[in-house]
């Protein structure tokens, strides 16, 4: 079995799922994708993308928490997760979560109906955010692919700052951000994703993930960038590493 995230939850990169699935099938291997981040946000065709199994979650598409969906291609045999009753085709015994099932079904239907319009708006907001940040804040890098990324994701690294301090100041300005995934909230270690793609610890420590919504406005994006510029300048002003860097640049 090969299992690959459809899109990364931190840096937003969309993986070449169809190509990976073809490689798996060419070698007689089943292919599963964790599509939690992508489901309801970008088009997914399990046939064209050579997907045998796919998992998704309700809360990522404004559905209920605690409910998910698992697609299994007809003919693929898997072991039961919970033995006992015959619920869910004998794959998971136990009483059905009817409110959750109805909720995720409705959320998926609504997400599909307005996906194109919603994604277009989020992409416009995302690209405006990325363009301004990279243009107006020096010594900054965008993490993840520039275009093959989730419509609502932007992830940056700012050199010479510490991410936790940046998040505190952003929070004081009324801006929600993170320096990793929700799964690792509370950890002061740099993102394992950023380390895995080759970033050194000192740069990975200055990461910021911003997740957008169709309900955000251009005014809010501009406010975020304006506040972020002040915060980065303030933190770098207190950084001995940045001071040493500037001195070397001026020699």
Q: Over which residues does each language-model region extend?
A:
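Pyridoxal 5′-phosphate
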Residues: 1-251
